Amino acid sequence: NLLDTADSYGDDGHNESLVGTALAGRRHEFVLATKTGWVKRAGPYGKEVVGVDGRPGRIRSACEASLARLKTDVIDLYYLHRVDLDVPAEESVGAMSELVAAGQVRSLGLWEVSEATLRRAHAVHPISALQSEYSLWTREPEETVMPACRELGIAFVPFSPLGRGFLTGAVKGREGIAPGDWRANNPRFSEENLARNAALLKPLEDIAQAHGSKPAQVALAWVLSRGDQVIPIPGMKRRGHLDENVAAVGIELTPEDMAEFDAAFPPGVAAGERYTPEVARWAGR
């Protein structure tokens, strides 16, 4: 019953508005999470991310706007979507803690920060959740922030647990990327890197076949197996995808499956960086 959105999803908080409308009369049934931090400006293809703003005043005004769009008086989990390179994380989290004190927010989260930043922020106000990319082809958090989350009692919330769609097996070449798809500019989805990464799918497909499941379901089952504090949030646009993801909960991977995954998907196995240099400078700060 966790719903995850952000003020930067769609133009002018459009996704938050959709969520707010959908939850009318049912708000109490869901844990509602949203985020702030990204700054967007008009571009040739709609509004585009141009920076990060973690100033206290901006965080307060962003929260007020999110509450209005979500049609609620409290946000269950409020994330700092990125750390502003010009504002100490402690200052941003301090402003967010004031929102908790005011009753507008129940708990705080961070998004793709380093272990050091996580610990500094947690010292200012308890951090309830850390959201970061994590999947079979992005296992680097196992060596950094995941141990810290276990130590501090922080939930680890993987986004893109299906490798931005790659682990579904639907994108094995550039022909699988439609015009306007943002992945067209992602390094891991370049023609050269896709050709190299496609070889990773064979062991995943073999294990999925053995379970009578789809590759995406087995990839999600692997993330779900990583610990009770790991709460993946796969993106879903279609009801069929939702049903498939729910079914992944019932897949029990064997020790042999896990060993095969470790051999086929060690940390750093994917060809290509996760982000372009322009976006990467805000990740893991």
Name the predicted role of every residue range:
Residues 1-34:
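N-terminal binding-site loop/beta-alpha segment at the start of enzyme catalytic domains
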Residues 3, 75, 108:
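Glycine-centered flexible beta-alpha turn that most often forms the glycine-rich phosphate-binding loop
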Residues 8, 83-264, 268, 278-285:
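Beta/alpha (TIM)-barrel catalytic core signal, keyed to glycine-rich beta->alpha loops juxtaposed to Asp/Glu
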Residues 20-31, 67-71, 100, 121-125:
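Acidic (Asp/Glu)-rich catalytic clusters
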Residues 45-60, 86:
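Active-site mouth loops of central-metabolism enzymes
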Residues 54-70, 114-120:
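Short, acidic/polar
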Residues 67-85:
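Active-site groove signature of glycoside hydrolases
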